[in-house]
């Protein structure tokens, strides 16, 4: 079998890997095999948590809206508030409603009075 001279290709690949793993702790930033494993693990976690972040923010928005609704005493439940929004065809998503609830509660109060039956 003939010898294959690869030159700088393997070194270039490892330096790219080292740049990616430079912030990892211990052997995960020093040893090539553990660097590759840790890189795969990091990318898997990043992919998983991109979806999780969307769910977490939706939960946060719902919690904020629910807290302000209970504080105002307009409706006794969050889901009834959202249901009445859809019935009146007001196109406000949960993110915008949460921002209104935080920054301008009187505006949310007027919205809730508009959609009351």
Curated annotation (Swiss-Prot):
One of its GO terms (cellular component) is chloroplast. It is found in: Plastid, Chloroplast. One of its GO terms (molecular function) is rRNA binding. Keywords: Chloroplast, Plastid, Ribonucleoprotein, Ribosomal protein, RNA-binding, rRNA-binding. Its main location: plastid. Pfam families: Ribosomal_L20. It comes from the Eukaryota. One of its GO terms (biological process) is ribosomal large subunit assembly. The keyword tRNA-binding does not apply. Binds directly to 23S ribosomal RNA and is necessary for the in vitro assembly process of the 50S ribosomal subunit. It is not involved in the protein synthesizing functions of that subunit. PANTHER family: 39S RIBOSOMAL PROTEIN L20. Belongs to the bacterial ribosomal protein bL20 family. This is Large ribosomal subunit protein bL20c.
